[in-house]
Amino acid sequence: DLYDRSLRLSKINEKIGPLFNINDNKKLNKLGLHSKLDLSSNLVGEFPELQGTMLKYLAKLNGFSKDMQFAFEDQYKPVGLNKNMPRNKLGSILSVSNNIDTLSCFFSIGLIPTGSRDPFALRRSGNSLINILWHETNTLSLNQLINSLDKKLSKDVKLVNEIKFFLIDRLYNFLIEEGFRSDKLSAIISKDNIDQKTFLEIK
């Protein structure tokens, strides 16, 4: 349910915050715990396009800081490879947490995209996640990202590998879109921790 998801997001936020040079665990925890409050409202139920935006106004009324208000509104950005990014690092953290949580939940019950079938838009979630990590951090540490998941999930070797290979595939496609040559990517793209400088040197 929404409460359980909010708890998961708060924990993921704390673990990936350092990737974005954000170490305020109290704020990261609060961000996750309140990130889905608008989804239980009748207004968002009737107009789902208002999710996030509705929460921003609720946060404003309840005295949340402006950076958290923006983060609540921007948590669903970017859409895939779209360049419309969150306005601050808190928004980026919450977006990445949302997407890695979504992937882990679907993958854990065997709902993995195959061929052209992707009814739950999981490739888009993967693209959004890679997009933010590329533009907002200095590393693409897939291990650290996956280790941010619930302990039970992060110890499931099969699940971890499925998510990792999926994200590596999304990263490969993202970098091709960014103008990298496929033959030069092959040698380094399967590494767990990837320094962006390594990629930029071969572009």
Predicted regions located by residue number:
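Amphipathic alpha-helical "coupling" segments that flank catalytic cores
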Residues: 1-203
